[in-house]
Amino acid sequence: MASTAGGAFGFASGLIIQEFGYDDDVDETLRQAAEAETGTTLVDEDYEDVADSAIVWWRDDDGDVDDLTDLLVDAQANLDGAGLIWVLTPKARTTGAVPAAEVEEAAATAGMHATSAASMGQHWSGIRVSSRGR
């Protein structure tokens, strides 16, 4: 698994990033890194316009693989074109951890695929998900 020092998502400047699953346990440093990369403020899940990419914070107690599939479908529907989605989960062997296989299964069921994985900060892992055509 690659490491992203400081949370480099690979977002381009000016992109609108929609955030799903925000709670008090998210890594503010990662959020700030995404905002620094784009030069824009993250928009929440109630944002009513199209976004370029998305960040999904997902924990074990947020639901099962079907719930994650539904959320990925919703996130993809809000994207302009085939934007990327980062699914961030607590690291393995920590409270709320989600097996990477669950994220991969949810992505496949949603018609997407996991393209890479990375260590995202001290407490989170990230799986980059994109549409199959990408």
Predicted ranges, named:
Residues 1-134:
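S-adenosyl-L-methionine-dependent methyltransferase catalytic core, i.e., the SAM/SAH-binding region
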